[in-house]
Design a protein with these regions (language model features):
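A short beta-strand-loop structural module common to alpha/beta enzyme folds
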Residues: 32-42
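Cysteine-cluster motifs in flexible loop/terminal segments that predominantly coordinate metals
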Residues: 42-73
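Glycine-rich phosphate/pyrophosphate-binding loop and the adjoining helix
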Residues: 1, 24, 28-29, 142-165
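Short, hinge-like loop/turn segments at secondary-structure boundaries
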Residues: 51-55, 99, 133, 162-163
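N-terminal beta1-alpha1 ligand-phosphate binding loop
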Residues: 2-32
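Short, glycine/serine-rich, charged loops/turns that create anion-binding
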Residues: 10-11, 41, 121
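Helix-loop-strand module that forms the ligand-binding subsite of alpha/beta enzymes
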Residues: 61-145
């Protein structure tokens, strides 16, 4: 069994990665393979509705990380998306990535489990959780539920001030 995890934060070792790493520990205890792909710092364009992906190629016209991740997405059994909250929604780079990834891949996703991890300092947790879960729901994927919208608390102010976490 394999779980593909997407880090939508622009910070490679930020709060979102810390939350995903906690999940990796649990998956490893259960003998589940994981891979984390960091997309939040990438230059990823949004979908331009050119329909190239629907004209037989099953890949996006922009040859970037989306096309590299698509085969891994097809092969995984679980798909976890982690994101920080910016202005009440997910990181826009992540949304561009997910929109193109889900739209350009035509394989059946109905038995692939999706899960969201949302990290915020203030508000926007529930709307961001809903925003990510819509990708799963629209694709007919079972959604791994959690308590209190899959959110995490930000790092403590002490940890932020010394930069050790």
């Amino acid at each position: 069994m394999k779980v593909l995890m997407i880090n939508g934060s622009p910070h490679v070792k930020g709060n979102t990665r810390i939350a995903l790493d906690e999940m990796v520990k649990i998956f490893e205890k259960e003998g589940i393979d994981t891979e984390i792909i960091h997309v939040g710092h990438q230059d990823i364009r949004g979908c331009i509705a050119c329909m190239t992906c629907k004209k037989g190629k099953n890949q996006c016209v922009f040859d970037d990380l989306v096309n590299q991740v698509a085969p891994k997405f097809e092969q995984c059994d679980g798909f976890v998306v982690g994101t920080p909250v910016y202005y009440g929604s997910a990181n826009s780079t992540l949304i561009s990535f997910l929109t193109r990834l889900f739209y350009s891949t035509s394989f059946d996703k109905t038995m692939k489990v999706g899960a969201s991890v949302v990290v915020a300092r203030r508000g926007g947790i529930s709307s961001t959780y809903d925003e990510i879960n819509k990708f799963f729901a629209i694709s007919g994927m079972p959604i791994a539920s959690t308590q209190y919208w899959g959110r995490t608390q930000r790092r403590s102010s002490m940890a932020l001030s010394i930069g050790t976490v």
